[in-house]
UniProtKB/Swiss-Prot annotation:
Homooligomer. Interacts with GLIPR2. Interacts with NOSTRIN. Interacts with SNAP25 and STX1A. Interacts (via the N-terminus) with DPP4; the interaction is direct. Interacts with CTNNB1, CDH1 and JUP. Interacts with PACSIN2; this interaction induces membrane tubulation. Interacts with SLC7A9. Interacts with BMX and BTK. Interacts with TGFBR1. Interacts with CAVIN3 (via leucine-zipper domain) in a cholesterol-sensitive manner. Interacts with CAVIN1. Interacts with EHD2 in a cholesterol-dependent manner. Residues 105-125 dip into the membrane without crossing it. InterPro entries: Caveolin, Caveolin_CS. Coiled coil: none annotated. The keyword Cell membrane applies. This is Caveolin-1. It is found in: Golgi apparatus membrane; Cell membrane; Membrane, Caveola; Membrane raft. A lipid is attached at C133, C143, C156 (S-palmitoyl cysteine).
Length: 178
């Protein structure tokens, strides 16, 4: 066992010795070892998607649920022929349905790519720029706040206390003369 390499009882070679409680590569605790092998890892990138309910968080409930009745309506007394009304309904519904599918087929993946890149950049900037800047600012402002606190307690507190004592002795009496 030279050169900092260690071999365990099963013949595995390690660069670090196995301690009594084990290490991250080979725990001595059998329960812990079994738990590590039995854990199921769930990855957010490989989760199953629901092809039936595609808006589980109801993001677009009030925005894009536009039906024929929401757009075109004939008031009482001004009705077109029933056949025209049915054909208009069918034309509107089918056109909206298939044109949405066509646009989704043409632009869905590129838009998903663009929005994925955008939110990746946004997340990156938030994690690596915004939060550290805010933390840095809070650390730096602590020094200024201590100096400001000393200034207020040294100069402003006595001044305003004296002004308060001056004005506390003023009495106002109001009388109504008839």
């Amino acid at each position: 066992m030279s050169g900092g390499k260690y071999v365990d009882s099963e013949g595995h070679l390690y660069t670090a010795p196995i301690r009594e409680q084990g290490n991250i590569y080979k725990p001595n605790n059998r329960d812990m070892a079994e738990e590590m092998h039995e854990k199921q890892v769930y990855d957010a990138h490989t989760k199953e998607i629901d092809l039936v309910n595609r808006d589980p968080k109801h993001l677009n409930d009030d925005v894009v649920k536009i039906d024929f009745e929401d757009v075109i309506a004939e008031p009482e007394g001004t009705h077109s022929f029933d056949g025209i009304w049915k054909a208009s309904f069918t034309t509107f519904t089918v056109t909206k349905y298939w044109f949405y599918r066509l646009l989704s087929a043409l632009f869905g993946i590129p838009m998903a790519l663009i929005w994925g890149i955008y939110f990746a950049i946004l997340s990156f900037l938030h994690i690596w720029a915004v939060v550290p800047c805010i933390k840095s600012f809070l650390i730096e402002i602590q020094c200024i706040s201590r100096v400001y606190s000393i200034y207020v307690h040294t100069f402003c507190d006595p001044l305003f206390e004296a002004i308060g004592k001056i004005f506390s002795s003023i009495r106002i009496n109001m009388q109504k003369e008839i």
